[in-house]
Amino acid sequence: MSGLSESAQLVKQALEKRGLETPMVPNQFSREEKKEKIEHHMREILSLLELDLTDDSLEETPRRIAKMYVDEVFSGLDYQNFPKITVIENKMNVSEMVRVKEITLTSTCEHHLVTIDGKAAVAYIPRGKIIGLSKINRIVRFFAQRPQVQERMTQQILVALQTLLESDDVAVTIDATHYCVKSRGVMDATSETTTTALGGIFKSNPATRAEFLHGLR
């Protein structure tokens, strides 16, 4: 894990220890090499679908997809992109719940590679450390930017924050629409999936759990 920030290393190790890391097999290709190979294979796929890649609307599509995969929608597979984290000592002795809700996220279902569109809410009880509020949103986005299942993504965000805050007292919930359900298969356009991950006092204390969940309404 040479070259990774300390925060990225700690989070990656914590997820691997708990069996929550996204299934990945490392390779030695650079970002540009990955784009070149993805572009080549995407060109083959689109040609097999009988699309005319000489058409001016389609000729750059394989390159666009390759760039999008590596630099954007799957950028969370690379821990070099893990956000820079600011954690400060809790000198103010803040002890009440900190909740961030309505965090928008766009991810990709790892089964069909179509969109997961949703919102997350995250809360924690400050102990020894406090995290910059924007960092919570960035952590959510990092784990959304990879092929995912919603249950794992919820747990990954929880463990990442527990690791960085050095506290179990974290809660995460995600409400999302899965386009593998909406645009194919059963084609249910209105259903949403909710997943929740609770740690520490959020799991052991019904009143704290209720305060978190009630605040999401």
Curated annotation (Swiss-Prot):
EC id: 3.5.4.16
Binding site for Zn(2+): 109, 112, 180
Top-level taxon in the UniProt lineage: Bacteria
Keywords linked to the UniProt accession: GTP-binding, Hydrolase, Metal-binding, Nucleotide-binding, One-carbon metabolism, Zinc
Reaction equations catalysed: GTP + H2O = 7,8-dihydroneopterin 3'-triphosphate + formate + H(+)
Any one of the GO BP annotations: tetrahydrobiopterin biosynthetic process
GO cellular component: cytoplasm
Record has Amino-acid biosynthesis as a keyword: no
Coiled coil (UniProt feature): none
Pathway assignment: Cofactor biosynthesis; 7,8-dihydroneopterin triphosphate biosynthesis; 7,8-dihydroneopterin triphosphate from GTP: step 1/1
EC class name: hydrolase
InterPro entries: GTP-CH-I_C/QueF, GTP-CH-I_N, GTP_CycHdrlase_I, GTP_CycHdrlase_I_CS, GTP_CycHdrlase_I_dom
Molecular-function GO term, any one: GTP binding
Subunit structure: Toroid-shaped homodecamer, composed of two pentamers of five dimers.
Protein family (similarity comment): Belongs to the GTP cyclohydrolase I family.
UniProt protein name: GTP cyclohydrolase 1
